[in-house]
């Protein structure tokens, strides 16, 4: 059902005629409704150029057909075709998904195109006075008959095309042949939890294609086709993690770690099975698990509220979580050439799903700050205790890969914070709420802060998908944009290539107004990046070289 309130056109259709003075002064006319009457038999093709129309009244005429070009009026919410001589309707009528009211009363219609089922925002469908089949009329005359009839037609509409085109692989740079680097792939994918996949949210998708038993096959096919070395998933239902994802991926050589959202602690055992969370999987032939961690944002918020009411009332009430696994990179993953350093090569892989509501940009930003603050503590402890031979126990000594559904656009404070290493404490995304007293708890500068009043983190991160490589990661009728990300430590890693987007024109040509779709099992597209890890170089004459060495340094080390 549509989310916005619909007000039908005023039947009186009041209008005002501009005076000669108004015309002379250059005043522009504005009209969005059109009525055509007079027992008209055919329609002029110039009608389809009036793309600004929101209401079209062509009832009480002698029209026997409606041309498919009517779908060129993309803003129509009201269409009255009643009391004509229509015997059929064009299938293209189903592309007019903005329609809220479609009146077809008193015509000669015996059948309806199943494409009408795609009109998921339609509230009123007038069919009285047509010689339709009894099955259609019976369904239409039931309580909430319009909705039931549209659902029936959508569920029985033939699906085209039969398969998706391949997404392109975008090569960004070549592997460093001079150094013993490790190359691996990382996937980030929000799989759309079953309980969120409702017809209320995704009315444009057939009910059978929203069903989890159908969608999970497409989701696993997407995962296995990508064959990533590290997989980060969001919106994984607890029961499905253990009975489906872990079970299936273990057979393919993965191990995994999962944690549900914090509300799992507060519900019954039966309800707990359906709480979603975040999971990380990794190929055991390439990585070994060292540590695993869960970060509950509401608990971190409570511990750092500093008496802040907005922290308690806005941040602590959200049950989002993040997970992290500390992995050892196995030596076989490194290319031949220089031997990798004898010390353990560690990698911190983090995965999170931030709060969804656009009105809570402050919460998303603080959740991100809390997550990086906790990751900093994890990295510092790991660097000091496990890799004590490292020249430093600083956070930056352990590289990080951060995958997340941030529910934030590229121009948001969240992405600015991650990409630039900090954000101003008076950033607009804080909504002028009083967080300043507790924000410094999450800054790498601690209570001292920075002179410019910014909140910083100590990870030097870069997005694998920079620029416009991916125009959208979330693709629904109401929203199309980038909210999913893969970040990595740019001091230790570089990105060699990424999986590109599904062609926008293909989606338009096939009238895919949003996902999920019978061929696209989630409302998100997966991200896949190939990363190259440059381990620290062994000391040269007692000096520790930078991670990214020059070719000259490489030559010196091989001699």
Curated annotation (Swiss-Prot):
Q: Which domain of life is it from?
A: Eukaryota
Provide the E.C. number(s) assigned to this enzyme. 3.1.13.4
Q: Which reaction does it catalyse?
A: Exonucleolytic cleavage of poly(A) to 5'-AMP
Cellular component aspect of the GO annotation: CCR4-NOT complex; cytoplasm; nucleus
Q: Tell me, what is one Gene Ontology molecular-function annotation carried by this entry? A: poly(A)-specific ribonuclease activity
GO BP, one annotated term: regulation of translation
Spell out the residue ranges making up region: Required for interaction with cnot1, cnot3 and cnot7: 1-148
User: Active-site positions, per UniProt?
Assistant: 405 (proton donor/acceptor)
Q: What class of enzyme is it?
A: hydrolase
Cell compartments where the protein resides: Cytoplasm; Nucleus
Q: Which ranges of the sequence are coiled-coil?
A: none
**LRR repeat residue numbers:** 52-73, 75-96, 98-120, 121-143
Q: How does it assemble?
A: Component of the CCR4-NOT complex.
Q: What does this protein do?
A: Poly(A) nuclease with 3'-5' RNase activity. Catalytic component of the CCR4-NOT complex which is one of the major cellular mRNA deadenylases and is linked to various cellular processes including bulk mRNA degradation, miRNA-mediated repression, translational repression during translational initiation and general transcription regulation. Additional complex functions may be a consequence of its influence on mRNA expression.
For this chain, the family text in UniProt reads: Belongs to the CCR4/nocturin family.
Protein name according to UniProt: CCR4-NOT transcription complex subunit 6-like
Which source organism?
A: Danio rerio
Q: What is the lineage of its organism?
A: Eukaryota, Metazoa, Chordata, Craniata, Vertebrata
